[in-house]
Amino acid sequence: MSPSAKKRPKNSRVSKMQDEKLRDETEQPVSKVIERNRLRTVLKNLSLLKLLKSSNRRIQELHKLAKRCWHSLLSVPKILRISSGENSACNKTKQNNEEFQEIGCSEKELKSKKLESTGDPKKKEYKEWKSQVQSGMRNKEKTSLAAMPRKEKHIEPEVPRTSRDDSLNPGVQGRQPLTEGPRVIFIKPYRNRTPMGHMKQLDVADQWIWFEGLPTRIHLPAPRVMCRSSTLRWVKRRCTRFCSASLEMPMWHPYKVDVTWTRARGASRGWRSRHQLKGRNGWRNSRVYK
């Protein structure tokens, strides 16, 4: 036994499932995976915005549109080559049912063969006699039917006539035999129609479909940033930035211009300049120059 043969799984179904997963991963290019992840992030951000700003109609419409797009991806996996959980589960159940049916048929055949091989000669004789009796009864019935007169032979039970509604619709008679056999349901391809218009119809094999009306990027509101951390807020002095200001709308203070101050500004300028000049050479401001 080689080491490669030992590593192989004993169950053939497990190996088949692994091969199918690898094929799905190789078939989907990198761009498709990126676009699917982008749609997922857009849906998450829109759901957060809906929680924060529930009264905004624009955000609600975008959230509904994103949900439709996501459900359409799950409902049409074959067209977009996406393996959804529901379809894989259905396929698994179908495969298991088929396998169980095959196993049941094989077991019945084996049991019948065993009975034939290990059966008693008396039972065999009884079976042969029973089959001969049944064939004789059938032949008697055929001869009795042939001996009946022609008039009685041709008399058949009258077929109940259809009502007026059925007579008006000739297609009803053609539909009746179809219901007896197995019904086949044909699912029409689901076409997404957004309020912005039809989706971009692109080649699925080469390009990925992006849905119209959805934003590619969503800017969530930024959290409030404090000027200092909680440990240093009371130790160090206050900073010039307002603590409760957010990044989106910083705080600003409007300055009111006083009329009296502007008028008296020129008159007081001369007195202030003289006082400053005298103070530089005096003893009052001597501490500054020491």
Curated annotation (Swiss-Prot):
Report the locations given in the UniProt record.
Cytoplasm; Nucleus
Induction (record text): By p53/TP53, UV irradiation, by hydrogen peroxide treatment or by treatment with a DNA-damaging reagent.
A single Pfam family, by name? Answer: TP53IP5
Q: Which cysteines are joined by disulfide bonds?
A: none
Identify the GO cellular component terms for this protein.
chromosome; cytoplasm; nucleolus; nucleus
UniProt entry keywords in alphabetical sequence: Cytoplasm, Nucleus
Q: Name one GO biological process term.
A: negative regulation of cell growth
Using the UniProt record, give the first listed, main subcellular location: cytoplasm
Entry-linked InterPro entries: TP53TG5 (IPR029290)
Q: In which tissues is it expressed?
A: Highly expressed in heart, brain and small intestine. Less abundant in skeletal muscle, spleen, prostate, ovary and colon. A smaller transcript is expressed specifically in the testis.
Please list the residue ranges that the record marks as compositionally biased, kind Basic and acidic residues.
16-26, 114-130, 138-167
Q: Where is the composition biased (Basic residues)?
A: 1-13
Q: How does it assemble?
A: Interacts with p53/TP53.
Q: Which PANTHER family match?
A: TP53-TARGET GENE 5 PROTEIN (PTHR15562:SF0)
Function in brief: May play a significant role in p53/TP53-mediating signaling pathway.
Q: What is this protein called?
A: TP53-target gene 5 protein
